[in-house]
Design a protein with these regions (language model features):
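Short, surface-exposed acidic-centric catalytic microdomains
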Residues: 30, 34-59, 63-67
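N-terminal Rossmann-like dinucleotide-binding module
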Residues: 1-43
Length: 162
């Protein structure tokens, strides 16, 4: 069974969907064993606690450099024997050391159908608002493997909604 860490920055609605799916037995090959928040006090940590999952905070601003932040994050993941990382509304960009430590084992959940409505500022409800403002008839979400290029060449799934 894979030990899964979910990285979050806010309310944790994607985290809750993953926890609910796990509770229904839909993920027999993995278990969420750690939630890492980018700041204290986010509701996602409360969701983790309610589900009996350990929650920790690793804040970028607590480290002098991005490399130091990445080292702290990597140490947190390794010390919890994490096999798979899911970015579920995590608003920090991971550095090369983290990505290299988890090749094709970091998944990002993006709230739009990539390549539309992605890039700076496109997180949370913003991609959906942009899609509505543009008059899109179909919207949805994308799950993709994270790579150093911040590209979307390794898409795992598109899920559309009307």
């Amino acid at each position: 069974m894979l030990n899964v860490a979910v990285l979050v920055s806010g309310g944790g609605t994607n985290l809750q969907a993953l926890l609910d799916s796990e509770a229904r037995g839909e993920n027999p090959n993995g278990k969420i064993t750690l939630v890492v928040a980018s700041k204290p006090g986010v509701y996602a940590l409360e969701r983790a606690a309610k589900a009996g999952v350990e929650g920790v905070v690793v804040r970028r601003k607590d480290y002098a450099t991005s490399e130091a932040f990445d080292a702290a994050l990597l140490e947190t993941l390794k010390s919890h024997n994490i096999d798979l990382v899911v970015l579920a509304g995590f608003l920090s960009v991971l550095g090369p050391s983290v990505i290299e430590a988890y090749p094709r084992r970091i998944l990002n959940v993006h709230p739009a159908l990539i390549p539309s409505f992605c890039g700076p500022g496109m997180y949370g409800l913003r991609p959906h608002q942009a899609a509505l403002a543009r008059g899109c008839k179909v919207t949805g979400a994308t799950v993709h493997f994270v790579n150093e290029a911040v590209s979307y060449t390794h898409l795992r799934a598109h899920e559309t909604t009307l």
